[in-house]
């Protein structure tokens, strides 16, 4: 089975959400459901997700925005996965 997560999204808006709202953004497989996305991210990065929002971008990519629990720091996770 291939990975549902294609890559972390690194934009100015994504960085603001990471800094101020404890959220991370990923480009994911267009057929992935919210539950599948949550399970994949939680198991891969060993974090707890509070909420997941998805949208299809104008370039036909699926963007997932996940809000992390207060116990997890989005900046630490981003550093671990190579965003910085």
From Swiss-Prot:
Q: Which PROSITE patterns match?
A: RIBOSOMAL_L23
Molecular function terms, GO-annotated? rRNA binding; structural constituent of ribosome
Q: Which InterPro entries match?
A: Nucleotide-bd_a/b_plait_sf, Ribosomal_uL23, Ribosomal_uL23-like, Ribosomal_uL23/eL15/eS24_sf, Ribosomal_uL23_CS
Gene Ontology CC terms, in alphabetical order: ribonucleoprotein complex; ribosome
| Glycoprotein is among the record's keywords | no
Instruction: Say which domain of life the source belongs to.
Output: Archaea
Matches recorded under Gene3D superfamilies: 3.30.70.330
Provide the alphabetized UniProt keywords. Answer: Ribonucleoprotein, Ribosomal protein, RNA-binding, rRNA-binding
Please give a single GO biological process term from the UniProt record: translation
- Subunit structure, as described in the record: Part of the 50S ribosomal subunit. Contacts protein L29.
The record describes the protein's role as: Binds to 23S rRNA. One of the proteins that surrounds the polypeptide exit tunnel on the outside of the ribosome.
The UniProt entry's sequence similarity note says:
Belongs to the universal ribosomal protein uL23 family.
Protein's recorded name: Large ribosomal subunit protein uL23
Organism expressing this protein natively? Haloquadratum walsbyi (strain DSM 16790 / HBSQ001)
Gene transcribed to yield this protein: rpl23
């Amino acid at each position: 089975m291939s990975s549902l997560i294609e890559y972390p999204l690194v934009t100015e808006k994504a960085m603001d959400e990471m800094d101020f709202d404890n959220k991370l953004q990923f480009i994911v497989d267009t057929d992935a459901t919210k539950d599948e996305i949550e399970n994949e991210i939680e198991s891969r990065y060993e974090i707890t997700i509070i909420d997941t929002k998805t949208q299809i971008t104008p370039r036909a990519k699926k963007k997932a925005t996940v809000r992390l629990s207060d116990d997890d720091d989005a900046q630490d996770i981003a550093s671990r996965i190579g965003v910085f």
